[in-house]
Regions:
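Intrinsically disordered, low-complexity
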Residues: 1-7, 115-117
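Extracytoplasmic/secreted envelope proteins and their assembly/folding machinery
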Residues: 2, 22-26, 55, 71, ...
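Catalytic cysteine-centered active-site loop
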Residues: 7-57
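Substrate-binding/catalytic groove segments of enzymes
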Residues: 34-38, 69, 81-85
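Aromatic- and glycine-rich peptidoglycan recognition patches
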Residues: 48-50, 76-117
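Structural motif
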Residues: 58-59, 75
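Short, Lys/Arg- and Gly-enriched loop/turn segments at beta-strand edges
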Residues: 68-75
């Protein structure tokens, strides 16, 4: 996914000309021959829910950014002692790496799922 850093946000997008959050995740995982549902809400039902303390690079991280259901997903890129960094496509900045410690994401964090073994 990191080769897509800087790509713009595009609703429904699945290519370097523009990604939405689930499009970035689907495209990245397809390269590993893993087919995921197209929406972040449906992706949250796939794989094994993991405790935040056991998160690993490649796990999916989910947020409620609109209302009361999961509406945003990213891929964990780095796990540090007190931080988890993830790549995602944000509506305002396109494909970027963010931290779970940023207030916006800290307040909206829901779960982490492992779909890779």
């Amino acid at each position: 996914a990191s080769q897509n850093l800087g790509a713009p946000y595009r609703s429904g997008g699945t290519s370097s000309s523009g990604f939405d959050c689930s499009g970035l995740v689907c495209t990245t995982y397809e390269k590993a021959n893993i087919k995921l549902p197209r929406s972040s809400h449906e992706m949250a039902t796939v794989g094994l829910k993991i405790n935040k303390l056991k998160a690993q690079k490649g796990d999916l991280i989910f947020f409620k950014t609109r209302g009361n259901r999961i509406s945003h997903v990213g891929i964990i890129t780095e796990v540090l002692d007190n931080d988890i960094k993830f790549i995602h496509s944000s509506t305002s900045s396109g494909v970027i790496i963010s931290s779970i410690n940023e207030d916006y994401y800290k307040k909206r964090f829901v779960q982490i799922n492992r779909v890779l073994n």
